[in-house]
Amino acid sequence: MLTKFETKSNRVKGLSFHPRRPWILASLHSGVIQMWDYRMGTLLDRFDEHDGPVRGVHFHATQPLFVSGGDDYKIKVWNYKTHRCLFTLHGHLDYIRTVQFHHEYPWIVSASDDQTIRIWNWQSRTCVAVLTGHNHYVMCASFHPKEDLVVSASLDQTVRVWDIGALRKKTVSPADDILRLTQMNTDLFGGVDAVVKYVLEGHDRGVNWASFHPTLPLIVSGADDRQVKLWRMNDTKAWEVDTLRGHMNNVSCVMFHAKQDIIVSNSEDKSIRVWDATKRTGIQTFRREHDRFWILAAHPEMNLLAAGHDNGMIVFKLERERPAFSVSGDTVFYVKDRFLRFFEYSTQKEVQLAPIRRPGSVSLNQSPRTLSYSPTENAVLICSDVDGGSYELYIVPKDSAGRTDYLQEAKKGAGGSAVFVARNRFAVLEKSSNQVLVKNLKNEIVKKSPLPIAMDAIYYAGTGNLLCKAEDRVTIFDLQQRLILGELQAPAVKYVVWSSDMESIALLSKHAVVIANKKLVHRCTLHETIRVKSGAWDENGVFIYTTLNHIKYCLPNGDSGIIKTLDVPIYITRAIGNNIFCLDRDGKNKLITVDASEYIFKLALLRKRYDHVMSMIKNSQLCGQAVISYLQQKGFPEVALHFVKDEKTRFNLALESGNIQIAVASAKEIDDKDHWYRLGIEALRQGNVGIVEYAYQRTKNFERLAFLYLITGYMDKVGFMCKIAGQNNNLMGQFHNALYLGDAMKRVEILENAGQLPLAYITAATHGLTEIADRLAAELGENIPSLPEGKTRSLLIPPAPLTASGDWPLLRVMRGIFEGGLDATGKAELEEDDEAAGADWGDEDLDMVDASEAMANGGDGFDAEEGEANEEDGEEGGWDLEDLELPPEAETPKNAGNALSVVFVAPPPGMPVSQIWTQKSSLAGEHAAAGNFDTAMRLLSRQLGIKNFAPLKPLFLDLHMGSHSYLRALATAPIIPVAVEKGWSESASPNVRGPPALVFTFSQMEDRLKAAYKATTEGKFPEALRQFLNILHTIPLIVVDSRREVDEVKELIEIVREYVLGLRMELKRKELRDDVNRQQELAAYFTNCKLQRVHMRLVLGSAMGLCYKQKNFATAEHFARMLLENNPNESQAKRARQVQQQCSGKKDSCELNYDYRNPFVVCGATYVPIYRGQKDVSCPYCGSRFVPSIEGQLCTICELAVVGADASGLLCSPTQLR
């Protein structure tokens, strides 16, 4: 059983599948009817008008209707689109057990505990027939799918078949009086339109269910005698064919499968049983622990069943329907109807190759699961779940195509899965021993390869390689070297899809798609809410995949979307352009044409193929909010502008892309204060003073406008702003403008008019306006304020700008491929916006005299209409522009955009020094000094296998800052960076640049080494370790000049590595308080490190003392002997001789994992010896050795590189590149 959907609810008594939609109705014992989408797993609606349990429910085949019958004796017809009950049919006198629509006529058949079956016309809402004859509860009744028959089951131990042919002949509406008479006769006597054709007796207890076969003259029934009986009928009689026994309690429901020759039954014994209808034997049994089953329903078209039980329902399939297939070149090989077939994509021709052996067992799920094809040998491997997992090998002759009589005896074998790994070799997974068996085409074992971890399945991963699936990961396994080449965390992978060039792989699990490259380096992961079914790579590197109800795409960067909605699931085999080839669940090849323009457009953007993008914009019908938002998210608002008609959206996109002309045009159309305000901010950012002025005028933001005039030097316009503020009675604005102008007389006048006579007097007296001050003093009388004494007087006036500045100069940039020319309309609009802006700024916004007069008259001085009127009148006034006397030939044409005449053409910039430094350099230190940290990291990763860059971050920053100096210029100018070059000379050519001067040198490393030696001698081990690691982290970034120095750098790495390993072991030893043996081992391993002689003497003395205390005399004697060989001082030598004398001839009290006779190195992670001849892996940078299990982890010595990573080696000098 393959469970597709499950619900938890009250007891389910009735079920019905929708014939086309993925919906199912469930009627509950609580009186509620639920409508579920079993594909999405969501509850769509609930209907709860019945009073008491609802036992019967059924969808109409074509109309948006369903019918329900309950214990309230009512039959209700519902419209699920309007979510309401249309009408209720009354007539039954007891519980209603089942209801069903006729597949063709407007009839409903219902069975009831009142011992009758009724047929209703739901269009006229009347009962057209009452079938009487049962003498106990009628448990079910249903129409025959094709003939005019009804079958019913009753607790009177009989199954009855009713002939309703006469009723069908009367379907033409009779006259009203005849209809009324017929209705009365039907209610009283049951009518004669339906008569009993057969009475089937044979059950010993009450019959709970009976149903017709979809096509054959068969009936199946289930009863309280725990038996399922099969009946056959013809035109004259019906008889019992066989009895199926096996249920341990009452059989609740039984029916024929819609597509397979099987019978499905469920029972109160908590089981569902599947029977072979031809052999009449049990095939399979599914049990639940606590839930009795009550009802079954079969989908009329699909291979789906549903069963209702005490605590809900389940929707399930009996067998997998995914066809086994394998794509090879222009052909897909697949299995259908027990035949191996192939389909050519180019000709769309299907050919039958050879029959496939049928499995001997009769159980379910025996169909092929996977198929692998070898094109050179024309061999096919078919795997299935038969006998717990087995494979069959077929060698198909070239001339067997189309022959149905050809039957070859397949070579068989047991195995979880099998795939071809070479031309004439295939691999079989043996799960019991967790090994891969490589076999030849004679099915003989050639090689056995044990797998490093337990695997569930294997897939092809290139010649000689296998992709092995474990529970939570996938790995690529090399069969020859028996090595894992790559690993990726991907739980519960079900299917694997390689791209045609074997460069990319998609791993499909139940609800996720993981994309990786051929080395299993993760690229992206997509999560789906419903099941992922299949997928294929198209020729552009886009992964096309299907879920239960969609065809979707996944771009290389992880962006995804929907291409098409599906009615039924399909399995993609190939995607070419707009064509998707697939197999359906019946094994039929289908071609689906889709619109690939959306993901091709996004892919072109991703790969920066802007010529392709522009062509698609011109020629295709790409539109919609999804494309616009995608372009905006990916940083292409200028492209999105060409799709947008809505002015507000155009305005936002124009601001985002910096297109001020389109923003002005849209702002005029919208004419909203907020939009003008935002336009002003963007124009100010771009330094477009004219647009800022216009935006401030449209929003009547006079304070900002006056300040703009002040900082741009238009002091005459500030004067006009002062006048306008006065006319608006804005005293604060008027006073601010007077301050800007430095007009003391005006300030005194404003303060006097405002009634602030003391302030007016102080202002006049301070600025030497004696006449006005005397007049004000007379008015103030005795209230004259005192002026401060002893201060030097100065004129409070803003600095006078030397020239009035216009728009900021704009650099000419290369015209973007998306700018202009995409369509004639867009180009014309841009030019029109430019002209409109120029006209407005020429007259309306500069004509401040007219504006002030208009405001004095109570009008709006900044209306666009006013400006346009002035323009039409041909007035040149405003800001005295008409006073300029220009020669006739120098006059600017009226339609020329004034912005174009003031564009500053900057000199072409040269190549940045940082680019020169990195252009031909492969030295990571120089790239870091230039600020190209990403390329520096890539170089270190490639050369030394470095993965952890966190320790290098401060060194990168020091290098970059140390190779640059910064020069301050004017207060308004930016700081100028100056590159610091190595060996710079004043006479050198400006076009010749030397390498950067680096702050880290080899001589510094030697000084640091001496300091680390000193800390080691003094026993400051944490400090010494920090200094040694600092050296190890800095070495990849230094640059030396000669080959001799390169050798010295490599020697320094070895020295530091030995000390870091020894110090780490010593610190580890000091942490271990209780494990005395481990302390001795670590001390012994420390003596194996290559140290300076002074340090070696200290290490040997420490190890000797520790072993002597623990009575390991033989080992202590060995250390004493080594100490005497290293020229100890007098006290050390005396102590060593004493130990040697005391330990002579004695043995160790405990065994240590230390054999000084056998040469070894110490693992840098586990601190265990790796003796000569044992396998090990090393760090590509520092050369530390590790046990093989550490491969792929971060080196614990240098803390930078990955153990076992591929690396080209240290590059620290230009001489290595010559």
Swiss-Prot record:
Keywords: Cytoplasm, Cytoplasmic vesicle, ER-Golgi transport, Golgi apparatus, Membrane, Protein transport, Repeat, Transport, WD repeat. Pfam families: B-prop_COPA_B_2nd (PF04053), COPI_C (PF06957), TPR_COPA_B (PF23953), WD40 (PF00400). WD repeats lie at residues 7-48, 49-88, 91-132, 133-172, 202-241, 246-285, 288-326, 363-404, 450-489. GO terms for cellular component: COPI vesicle coat; Golgi membrane. Its main location: cytoplasm. Signal peptide: none annotated. The coatomer is a cytosolic protein complex that binds to dilysine motifs and reversibly associates with Golgi non-clathrin-coated vesicles, which further mediate biosynthetic protein transport from the ER, via the Golgi up to the trans Golgi network. Coatomer complex is required for budding from Golgi membranes, and is essential for the retrograde Golgi-to-ER transport of dilysine-tagged proteins. Oligomeric complex that consists of at least the alpha, beta, beta', gamma, delta, epsilon and zeta subunits. This is Coatomer subunit alpha-3. It comes from Oryza sativa subsp. japonica. The lineage of its organism: Eukaryota, Viridiplantae, Streptophyta, Embryophyta, Tracheophyta.
